[in-house]
């Protein structure tokens, strides 16, 4: 089991943060990174949903101490409904906060081939488009850091063999057996058996599909100007820009994208000007000065964007959209 050379090259020249749970996947990735002599620290969420949750946290602290690594831990609140989405949002918000505050270049995730195929099937079942169906990439640029998934083309069976061969300790997550979570239902009934039998062909297919995705959507069309992400008025490009800001859109939200200026998920704003989409963090301002409002009116700056420009002292004349 090996990490690709191009991913290793990135890891060796940046400051790295590993999302760690002490489950099988992140434990395997921990020791694989150690084997490759990659420097990294740990970040962990304790959801307190399992009987071993606090023990996992304690053991993670001991592991970090043993190998001289920093570890950042946060306890999640009890989510009353829609656990999967709320837990994911909570997790990534904390990961991003640590990356920004501690200047990490890379957030390393332990997603593997089985996860990639599960995601594919989940999105397919929801009627998603190509950009969402192929939502996982080995290297995914966010605004201030990059997501890296070194195990994305490695199967769960290969990870299990690595753990057994190296005699690596990890905690079994019993919640993975609970089919009330949609991902677990897909895993148990559809994806795992398929990946076990056809993993080599699946790896090739996902590799080809990713190349096709890049050519089709040309994500280089997303430009950044002073914190604003700007792209042509194209649903998939806009969804990608929103994801770069840390928000994964639902099918219902995607349907609203091209209808006009809006706020997505209460935190990401979308505005249009001259057939260009502008994606940015949603902000408000108590009162805009009259002269600034007039400058915005003359320049035809979308109303939703004005508070952001004012708060960040962005010169309107410097904007090229």
Swiss-Prot record:
<dbReference type="GO" id="GO:0005524">
    <property type="term" value="F:ATP binding"/>
</dbReference>
<comment type="function">
    <text>Ligates lysine onto the cytidine present at position 34 of the AUA codon-specific tRNA(Ile) that contains the anticodon CAU, in an ATP-dependent manner. Cytidine is converted to lysidine, thus changing the amino acid specificity of the tRNA from methionine to isoleucine.</text>
</comment>
<dbReference type="GO" id="GO:0032267">
    <property type="term" value="F:tRNA(Ile)-lysidine synthase activity"/>
</dbReference>
<feature type="binding site">
    <location>
        <begin position="21"/>
        <end position="26"/>
    </location>
    <ligand>
        <name>ATP</name>
    </ligand>
</feature>
<dbReference type="GO" id="GO:0006400">
    <property type="term" value="P:tRNA modification"/>
</dbReference>
<keyword id="KW-0819">tRNA processing</keyword>
<keyword id="KW-0547">Nucleotide-binding</keyword>
<dbReference type="Pfam" id="PF01171">
    <property type="entry name" value="ATP_bind_3"/>
</dbReference>
<keyword id="KW-0963">Cytoplasm</keyword>
<dbReference type="GO" id="GO:0005737">
    <property type="term" value="C:cytoplasm"/>
</dbReference>
<dbReference type="InterPro" id="IPR014729">
    <property type="entry name" value="Rossmann-like_a/b/a_fold"/>
</dbReference>
<comment type="similarity">
    <text>Belongs to the tRNA(Ile)-lysidine synthase family.</text>
</comment>
<dbReference type="InterPro" id="IPR012795">
    <property type="entry name" value="tRNA_Ile_lys_synt_N"/>
</dbReference>
<dbReference type="InterPro" id="IPR011063">
    <property type="entry name" value="TilS/TtcA_N"/>
</dbReference>
<keyword id="KW-0436">Ligase</keyword>
<dbReference type="InterPro" id="IPR012094">
    <property type="entry name" value="tRNA_Ile_lys_synt"/>
</dbReference>
<keyword id="KW-0067">ATP-binding</keyword>
<protein>
    <recommendedName>
        <fullName>tRNA(Ile)-lysidine synthase</fullName>
        <ecNumber>6.3.4.19</ecNumber>
    </recommendedName>
</protein>
